[in-house]
């Protein structure tokens, strides 16, 4: 494990990546994350369901992009800690030659990802870059060293847009990355919304605990990020309903998390 990242890990303040891992039943968290994670569950018991369902949504999205849409390059921004059904595993199971670039700057996520996130095929490429979500120009510049930006790319913002300080920042981050991609690329994202007052309260309390602020937004604000893009079938809606089938646990359960997938014309 890279010592430079181990030394940067803060165990005195909570991390959204580690709390998310706690909610998903993982082991990569510290006591401060467990305390905040358990307190969050008391405020919004649905958050554990959101954690599981968001991962299932990601898997369905990647299978669609690698399969029907024939995308062979993926840029997963704000990926967090490795867990089940990681993007490269799903993509390379469909298309062995898939290239996947993960973006995050959480030290523990970087430490674990570089140790665990390896291509599952000889033909595929899997890389993990240390970039700040708030620096889209840097993300594009570093991703260009691995991905071919003259060919379509599947760009993913899975449950991270709330880290944007303002609505304008959120749109700027997404648009800067998407503007660098060619026609035929896809934007895939989801986020929690203000439909649930419990979720809004959870985000407020998380910020008070010392974590990096997370700002829930309305459905309309999240949907507006897709303006100018063409939604694929299923459109924009609850992540539990997006191209879902009855075989998944908790299928069609209503939660206040919305997203979709859209093609860049």
Regions found by a protein language model. Give the residues of each.
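Conserved S-adenosyl-L-methionine
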Residues: 20, 230-243
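A short SAM/SAH-binding and catalytic strip from SAM-dependent methyltransferases
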Residues: 133-134, 143-171
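Conserved beta-strand signature within the Rossmann-like core of class I S-adenosyl-L-methionine
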Residues: 154-157, 180-192
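A short glycine-rich, Lys/Arg-flanked "PGG" loop and its adjoining helix->strand segment in the class I
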Residues: 171-183
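Short alpha-helix
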Residues: 213-236
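Core SAM-dependent methyltransferase catalytic element
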Residues: 241-265
